[in-house]
């Protein structure tokens, strides 16, 4: 199949999606089996390469001494999954059309799990539901991937299919997939060069994959530099994540758990990096179960909303130099009542580092905008650093960088937006300048950097970025909303977007509704106590 990787991904998707349409299957019924076949094709490719290498090495030693038989361990020591004959992709493709193909693929998946214990209960085994004609066509389609492809083509195909399935599955898709450009921006700002990574809402593992690519791009081996840990509530999504790691040549300790109540990795103070896209505005969390949990050093919110539970999970998992980057509902930046008190303590700790406002239509499930939060516990250690004192005369640990990226995007289609590689690099460079670090320009951000930062040093840019002191944040009611600080660029009036403004007002209404609900609970509680006292 000639052509670049993007062409390969699109052609494979078009072929697979056409088969889905003809099969009358729902996307949710089709996605996991198809992703499983991509995984199998990857495993077969790696096994075939390792098999040739092992045989070549044995041929070179032939005659020197008696050689033992080749074993499963010979493949595992090379980091390759062992595939018995019945699990080879070519064997499945060559099966006669009269045979039960679904049953044969199920057997292949079971055999792989038996020979590779790390994959126990991970691989899909529901291929008998798809029908012979569909499976034969899928096998032939994926068999077209060339065996001598360069780079991470299988991982990119898997990731491409994940995104497409997430888009087609709507709300369910958004539960397991974060748009890649959002993930890349988080990774570029926290810069996970080396250390232990945690995603306590790991979904299909996109944060891990992009972190590994970041390490590779800086000429290092991810397996040597980063250790991967995750938790995910939905069992099927855990399996997607483990397959995703495998097709990218990564290993990780990802477990099924409800992060509100379970901390299987004993995370407090343990991790160098935390990344996540948690579910927003979750209610009915049983706070009695977690009231003594050390993961919540600033106390539990009284409001029936899980946002500040998640924020503290991320904060508490960081070690003394750790950084976190995560997606959060806009309402979290201005929430009042007990959530304000938690936010105040977080800001006073000095860990709040960078806040990035992202526009609407970046996600597949909701059109609302969001905010990216970045924490850095290492900021408190900057007193002796040459970069510690900013141009405004205040140590960096007493400031927060606010970036308004709501008007920075590429329109993918009518309903979806994304960041381009140059835009991601540009936004990350603003954070790098704020931290006194060297910028990167390999992705095409040079022109944007020259326009706004011609001297190569940080400065506030109206409508884009502003460094704000803790005192000024306190004066604004401890708000972490970039829109309150960054101001408006001169051309903003011409670019006025009614939908964008309506969305912002909707977010403000959410905050007010949350506050009203919290006050209602307080009044109800106080009334109950008063009646008990009078009785």
What are these regions (language model features)?
Residues 1-193, 253-267, 357-361, 378, ...:
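Non-catalytic, mostly N-terminal accessory regions of nucleic-acid modification and defense proteins
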Residues 27-30, 34-38, 238, 242, ...:
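Conserved Class I SAM-dependent methyltransferase catalytic core
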Residues 30, 271, 293-295, 305-306, ...:
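Active-site lining segments that contact anionic ligands and/or coordinate catalytic metals
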Residues 41-54, 165, 215, 219, ...:
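A generic secondary-structure signal for well-formed alpha-helical elements
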Residues 172-276, 281-285, 290-297, 308, ...:
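Conserved S-adenosyl-L-methionine
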Residues 209, 239, 276-278, 308-312, ...:
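Feature representing long, continuous alpha-helical segments
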Residues 285-305, 330-338, 359-365, 414-422, ...:
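Short, contiguous acidic/charged loop-to-helix segments that flank catalytic cores in large enzymes
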Residues 382, 389-391:
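Leucine-biased recognition of intrinsically disordered, low-complexity hydrophobic segments
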């Amino acid at each position: 199949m000639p052509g670049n990787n993007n062409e390969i991904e699109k052609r494979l998707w078009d072929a697979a999606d056409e088969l889905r349409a003809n099969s009358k299957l729902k996307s949710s019924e089709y996605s996991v089996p198809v992703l499983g076949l991509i995984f199998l094709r990857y495993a077969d490719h790696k096994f075939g390469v390792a098999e040739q290498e092992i045989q070549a090495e044995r041929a070179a030693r032939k005659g020197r001494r008696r050689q033992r038989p080749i074993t499963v361990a010979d493949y595992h020591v090379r980091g390759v999954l062992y595939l018995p004959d019945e699990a080879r992709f070519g064997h499945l493709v060559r099966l006669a059309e009269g045979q039960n193909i679904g049953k044969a693929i199920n057997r292949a998946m079971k055999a792989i799990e038996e020979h590779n214990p790390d994959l126990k209960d991970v691989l899909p085994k529901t291929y008998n539901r798809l029908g012979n004609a569909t499976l034969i066509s899928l096998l032939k389609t994926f068999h077209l991937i060339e065996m001598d492809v360069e780079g991470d083509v299988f991982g990119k195909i898997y990731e491409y299919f994940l995104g497409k399935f997430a888009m087609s599955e709507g709300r369910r898709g958004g539960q397991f997939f974060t748009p890649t450009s959002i993930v890349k921006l988080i990774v570029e700002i926290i810069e996970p060069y080396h250390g232990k990574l945690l995603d306590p809402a790991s979904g299909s593992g996109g944060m891990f994959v992009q972190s590994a690519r970041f390490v590779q791009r800086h000429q290092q081996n991810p397996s040597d530099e980063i250790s991967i840990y995750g938790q995910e509530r939905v069992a099927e999504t855990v399996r997607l994540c483990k397959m995703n790691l495998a097709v990218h040549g990564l290993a990780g300790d990802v477990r099924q758990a409800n992060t509100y109540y379970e901390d299987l990795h004993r995370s407090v103070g343990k991790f160098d990096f935390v990344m996540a896209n948690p579910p927003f505005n979750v209610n009915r969390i049983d706070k009695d179960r977690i009231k003594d949990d050390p993961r919540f050093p600033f106390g539990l919110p009284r409001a029936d909303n899980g946002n500040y539970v998640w924020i503290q999970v991320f904060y508490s998992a960081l070690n003394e130099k750790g950084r976190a980057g995560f997606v959060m509902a806009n309402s979290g930046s201005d929430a009042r009542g007990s959530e304000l008190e938690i936010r105040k303590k977080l800001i006073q700790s000095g860990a709040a580092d960078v806040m990035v406002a992202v526009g609407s239509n970046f996600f597949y499930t909701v059109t609302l905008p969001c905010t990216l939060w970045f924490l850095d516990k290492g900021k408190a250690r900057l007193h002796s650093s040459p970069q510690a004192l900013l141009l405004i005369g205040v140590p960096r640990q007493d400031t927060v960088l606010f970036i308004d990226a709501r008007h920075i995007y590429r329109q993918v289609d009518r309903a979806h937006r994304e960041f381009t590689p140059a835009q991601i690099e540009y936004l990350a460079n603003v954070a790098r300048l704020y931290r006194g670090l060297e910028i990167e320009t390999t992705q095409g951000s040079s022109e944007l950097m020259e326009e706004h930062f011609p001297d190569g040093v940080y400065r506030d840019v109206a409508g884009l970025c502003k460094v704000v002191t803790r005192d000024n944040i306190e004066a604004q009611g401890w708000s972490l909303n970039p829109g309150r600080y960054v101001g408006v660029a001169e051309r903003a009036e011409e670019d006025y977007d009614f939908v964008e403004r309506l969305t912002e007002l909707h977010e403000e209404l959410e905050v007010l509704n949350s506050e009203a609900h919290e006050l209602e609970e307080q009044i109800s509680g106080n009334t109950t106590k008063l009646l008990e006292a009078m009785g």
